[in-house]
Amino acid sequence: MTQVDYTRAAKYFLLQDFWVGMKLGMKYFFAPKATLNYPHEKGPLSPRFRGEHALRRYPNGEERCIACKLCEAVCPAQAITIDAEPRDDGSRRTTRYDIDMTKCIYCGFCEEACPVDAIVEGPNFEFSTETREELYYDKDRLLANGERWEAEIARNLEMDAPYR
């Protein structure tokens, strides 16, 4: 005669595994949500976030870039192209500053190499395009990005200053 395992039969007939699963499901059903409804809700960004590139200006309106070409030299993807000419006062300024965003790997080396904080990676990460040509940024577009995001860029650089 075989011995019957009553605990195993009780678990089977009382649907214990089912109720354990239902309890777990109800626990997560009423718990706070871990995800955001992205297009309508946005999460916080770190001050060190590396998004869309921008060229900055001084408060008097003059461009910060001194055409040292350190960012071009340090770029591992070779995404930056700079041409410069001397000005009447003897300083150099860029005549061409292009970034090929299809090559850029968002490493931040250009931002770290810049001695005057001219090139920065701003807080904007929503810059999808319909054509590849729109991802070739010229100097005018980079300066426009800098003007658009200057307040937030300056605040982020100030918050990051103790760690530089």
UniProtKB/Swiss-Prot annotation:
Biological processes per GO annotation: aerobic respiration
Cofactor binding note from Swiss-Prot or TrEMBL: Binds 2 [4Fe-4S] clusters per subunit.
Catalytic activity from the UniProt record: a quinone + NADH + 5 H(+)(in) = a quinol + NAD(+) + 4 H(+)(out)
Subcellular location: Cell inner membrane
Membrane topology category: Peripheral membrane protein
Binding positions ([4Fe-4S] cluster 1): C65, C68, C71, C114
Record Gene3D superfamilies: 3.30.70.3270
Pfam family membership, one: Fer4_7
Keyword Metal-binding attributed: yes
GO molecular function, one term: 4 iron, 4 sulfur cluster binding
Domain 4Fe-4S ferredoxin-type: 55-85, 95-124
Entry keyword set: 4Fe-4S, Cell inner membrane, Cell membrane, Iron, Iron-sulfur, Membrane, Metal-binding, NAD, Quinone, Repeat, Translocase, Ubiquinone
Signal sequence, start to end: none
Cellular component GO terms, alphabetical: plasma membrane
InterPro entries referenced in this protein's UniProt entry, alphabetically: 4Fe4S_Fe-S-bd (IPR017896), 4Fe4S_Fe_S_CS (IPR017900), NADH_quinone_OxRdtase_chainI (IPR010226)
Annotated [4Fe-4S] cluster 2 binding sites: C75, C104, C107, C110
Similarity comment: Belongs to the complex I 23 kDa subunit family.
Assembly and binders: NDH-1 is composed of 14 different subunits. Subunits NuoA, H, J, K, L, M, N constitute the membrane sector of the complex.
NCBIfam families: NuoI, PRK05888.1-4, PRK05888.1-5
Annotated function: NDH-1 shuttles electrons from NADH, via FMN and iron-sulfur (Fe-S) centers, to quinones in the respiratory chain. The immediate electron acceptor for the enzyme in this species is believed to be ubiquinone. Couples the redox reaction to proton translocation (for every two electrons transferred, four hydrogen ions are translocated across the cytoplasmic membrane), and thus conserves the redox energy in a proton gradient.
Protein name: NADH-quinone oxidoreductase subunit I
Lineage: Bacteria, Pseudomonadati, Pseudomonadota, Alphaproteobacteria, Rhodobacterales
